[in-house]
């Protein structure tokens, strides 16, 4: 009997050791040197919820060359930063109840922060928390007139202060997209540096357009340029931008519902690669033969210099 108990304890210890080693090896590999990880969102075509996607379902191309997917896994934990442009018309606060519902519908593995874009900076109102009711309490009326700024500089400020992480990271920007510091003629000069920073840090930037308090934002061409910059920012970071014409949306709910589905169908793709002697960006493409499924992903990734 004693011998059987001893053997059982040894077997249990070996099993636990194998589990711990396996988990550690997976985590170490995902964040190890010579590897790059990017977030991929599976999207069901024609509003169909996408099925689960396995590593074998994915074809990955780096600079047009088929490249092996080293690791493909569900992104369980998410850090979602909500950045609200403080120059928005105060009527946007009519949408806050829907935004609160979106917060509260997120799983406990989602950590939400709330910040306001003002004077080229991200003013933090609530740090990351999975207490979604607490995050919702940070929603307030925007300042409106007099708070004109650059949402792109505020995004850069937010990302520069965001610690590195192997988990999924997204930003939801609610803004007109108008750059009152440097203009949108024809595009804000800070858009490129913003999406490149996001690509380096593997951050998706989603956006919802809302008009700001300045009457000039209601002019078609100015609003159109702002929307174009928001759309480009989303496209370059593997996300989407939501708007309906240049007027204020009647409701954020359809956008937030779609965003919730996207966030629930994200994966982390890891591949082996580096930039050689000098860091660089490389174009990527991700496809699948699964029916009714397509991917949202950044069109290029950052390859750090070889160590």
Task: Give the ranges of each region predicted by the language model.
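N-terminal secretory signal peptides that target proteins for export/translocation
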Residues: 1-8
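Bacterial N-terminal signal peptides
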Residues: 11-24
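Scaffold/interface architecture of coatomer-like assemblies
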Residues: 29-307
